């Protein structure tokens, strides 16, 4: 039995619960705590049934247990508003934060684009952008690694049922954080992000549209090849990531139309937006965990 790094999940909503299912399968990570703020929460009850310790008094109620249970990684799936405080308190105890909110106080991580850059940087907080960011930024990066992109615009459409209260409270943060990461990680000089929450019944699968304006006439063959190579990289951890149409070339505009089907861990397969976020978060944490198990990464407390 290989050693596993113990983890805590903060926020027992759609994202936190879906992530829990994925961590249960991880060869490097062992989820041991689920932290919420409502003792009646379905997510906390479900986590307890799955054998986790639970706490309904927020991060403050969990702090005394961090060191005794040797928790080294925490995933925050709450809300951008509370993430900074959660991170400060846990970083002070030497816990690495994987931020699944749009708070973006740490550097962005989109695994197929820049995961390897985070190795050896000794960061104690990394941000997973947003579900829309994880689904679309690889496509912007696939174009920008071929030639300069003056403008990148992404539209993420998710089903109403998959967007919980935390997601809805963070719409403005979603658009700002995603647009920022389209620039910083995707490589576009200017980025824009739009989210659409679709109430259709039965719920629709996540769909994503990506438009890039290249500075010069697009090299169609090279861009097409780059996009297909990037899709294969994303499919390594999100098998339901699929090209529906494109790349479509119109002058200097390159358009790509994607859909993301989930594994159906917590919500049914239409909720690909949960999968792409939680799988990316788990993949990122596993990379840090592998380093920790090998002994090449030792977490140090950070005092703000």
Swiss-Prot record:
One BP annotation, GO = catabolic process
The cross-references to InterPro entries, in alphabetical order and at most eight, read:
Acetaldehyde_dehydrogenase, Acetylaldehyde_DH_C, NAD(P)-bd_dom_sf, Semialdehyde_DH_NAD-bd
GO MF, any single term? NAD binding
Highest taxon, organism lineage: Bacteria
Catalytically driven reaction(s): acetaldehyde + NAD(+) + CoA = acetyl-CoA + NADH + H(+)
Top-level class of the enzyme under EC nomenclature: oxidoreductase
> Where are the catalytic residues?
131 (acyl-thioester intermediate)
Looking at the keywords, is Amino-acid biosynthesis present?
Answer: no
Instruction: Look up the EC number in the record and give it.
Output: 1.2.1.10
Binding-site residues, NAD(+): 162-170, 273
Is the keyword Oxidoreductase assigned to this protein? yes
Q: What UniProt keywords apply to this chain's record, in alphabetical order?
A: Aromatic hydrocarbons catabolism, NAD, Oxidoreductase
Belongs to which family?
A: Belongs to the acetaldehyde dehydrogenase family.
**Name the record gives this protein:** Acetaldehyde dehydrogenase 4
């Amino acid at each position: 039995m290989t050693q596993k790094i113990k983890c805590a999940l903060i926020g027992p909503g759609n994202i936190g619960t879906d992530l829990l299912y994925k961590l249960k399968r991880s060869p490097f990570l062992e989820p041991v705590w689920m932290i919420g703020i409502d003792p009646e929460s379905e997510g906390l009850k479900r986590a307890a049934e799955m054998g986790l310790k639970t706490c309904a008094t927020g991060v403050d109620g969990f702090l005394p247990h961090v060191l005794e249970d040797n928790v080294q990684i925490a995933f925050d799936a709450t809300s951008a508003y509370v993430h900074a405080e959660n991170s400060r308190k846990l970083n002070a105890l030497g816990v690495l934060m994987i931020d699944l909110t749009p708070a973006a106080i740490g550097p962005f991580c989109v695994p197929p684009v820049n995961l390897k850059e985070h190795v050896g940087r000794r960061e104690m907080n990394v941000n997973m952008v947003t579900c829309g960011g994880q689904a679309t930024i690889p496509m912007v990066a696939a174009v920008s690694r071929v030639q300069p992109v003056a403008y990148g615009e992404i539209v993420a459409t998710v089903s109403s049922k998959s967007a919980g209260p935390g997601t809805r409270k963070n719409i403005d943060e979603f658009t700002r954080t995603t647009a920022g990461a389209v620039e910083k990680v995707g490589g576009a000089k200017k980025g824009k992000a739009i989210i659409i929450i679709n109430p259709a019944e039965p719920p629709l699968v996540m769909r994503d549209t990506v438009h890039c304006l290249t500075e010069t006439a697009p090299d169609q063959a090279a861009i097409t090849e780059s996009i297909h190579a990037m899709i294969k990289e994303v499919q390594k951890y999100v098998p339901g990531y699929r090209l529906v149409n494109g790349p479509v070339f119109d002058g200097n505009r390159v358009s790509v139309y994607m859909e993301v089907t989930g594994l159906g861990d917590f919500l049914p397969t239409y909720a690909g937006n949960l999968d792409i976020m939680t799988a990316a978060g788990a993949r990122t944490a596993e990379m840090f965990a592998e380093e920790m198990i090998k002994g090449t990464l030792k977490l140090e407390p950070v005092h703000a």
